[in-house]
UniProtKB/Swiss-Prot annotation:
Keyword tags: DNA-binding, Nucleus
Residues covered by region (Disordered): 42-102
Lineage of producing organism: Eukaryota, Metazoa, Ecdysozoa, Nematoda, Chromadorea
Name of the molecule in the record: Forkhead box protein fkh-2
Xref: CDD domains: FH_FOXG
Residue ranges with Basic and acidic residues bias: 74-83
SUPFAM superfamilies with a match to the protein in the record: Winged helix' DNA-binding domain
Length: 279
């Protein structure tokens, strides 16, 4: 009996199948190279590589205090876009101009204005003058930022409104820094926003606890969490007769529980009785 193969009968089909298989292998290798390129490329979006690599969050010990209100939506968007790591190298080498938008939040600008004033207090007009004098960017961009300054003065607890004295000529109240924020709040160098350090009182309490905590636990063992609770002697050993519980009443008997065969038999008996009555 003669032997033959599928290659002899349909050589064109076998050739097409081989071409398809080779194309799939080539496509798979191309996708792997593209994925590796996307991982190494800093311009690749985070969303496209979240299943491959993840970035750990930065752990900052300082507490972020700044929640600035920004009424300049278009300017804030453009500033975020300008900080993209995929920007052109010529843009990175471009020197910063005094007319560029400063990298500080509105709360940070207010704090700098008040701290640099001789009396450590300023009116709203004085804060405007400080910003316009030191940051020329806001001279040509007056839309929105003055409203943002007013909103942040009212919302941030670090800024306190002080009424003007009766013998002080002029208009408007003064704004000062709260005493608790003057030493504990600073401007972050990387973010340009207000951040809060741990308070001096909190650090002093923690240091005192570390130094005297063990000695206090030995002197007052009742406050030591490691010891078991002390037994308490009850004031009344036996309850009064008037408060003794009444005797329990007998519970009513429950309905009998039948099994499935018993229920079927009861049903058949009932049907037979009804059938006998009909006859």
């Amino acid at each position: 009996m003669a032997r033959f193969s599928i290659l002899d009968l349909c050589p064109d089909l076998v050739e097409k199948a081989m071409n398809v298989q080779n194309g799939l292998v080539s496509m798979q290798s191309t996708l792997q190279l593209q994925a590796q390129k996307d991982i190494n490329d800093p311009c690749t979006s985070i969303d496209s590589t979240t299943d491959i690599m993840s970035n750990p969050a930065n752990d900052n010990s300082d507490y972020l205090l700044d929640e600035s209100v920004d009424d300049e939506r278009s300017e804030s968007t453009s500033s975020k876009d300008s900080k993209s790591p995929c920007s052109n190298s010529s843009d990175d080498k471009k020197p910063s101009s005094p007319n560029d938008k400063p990298p500080f939040s509105y709360n940070a600008l207010i704090m700098m204005a008040i701290k640099n004033s001789p009396e450590k207090r300023l009116t709203l007009a004085g804060i405007y003058d400080y910003i316009l004098t030191n940051y020329p960017f806001y001279r040509d961009n007056k839309q929105g930022w003055q409203n943002s300054i007013r909103h942040n003065l009212s919302l941030n607890k670090c800024f306190v409104k002080v009424p003007r004295n009766f013998d002080d000529p002029g208009k408007g109240n003064y704004w000062m820094l709260d005493a608790t924020c003057e030493d504990e709040v600073f401007i972050g160098g990387a973010t340009g926003k207000l951040r809060r350090r741990p308070s001096t009182l909190s650090r002093a309490r923690m240091d005192a606890y570390k130094q005297y905590g063990a000695a206090a636990a030995n002197l007052f063992p009742y406050f030591n969490p490691g010891l078991p609770p002390m037994p308490r002697t009850p004031f009344i050993t036996t309850p009064p007769t008037a408060f003794l519980p009444r005797p329990m009443m007998p519970m009513p008997s429950l309905a009998p529980v039948f099994t499935q065969p018993e229920l079927i038999q009861m049903y058949l008996n009932q049907q037979q009785g009804l059938f006998a009555k009909l006859q």
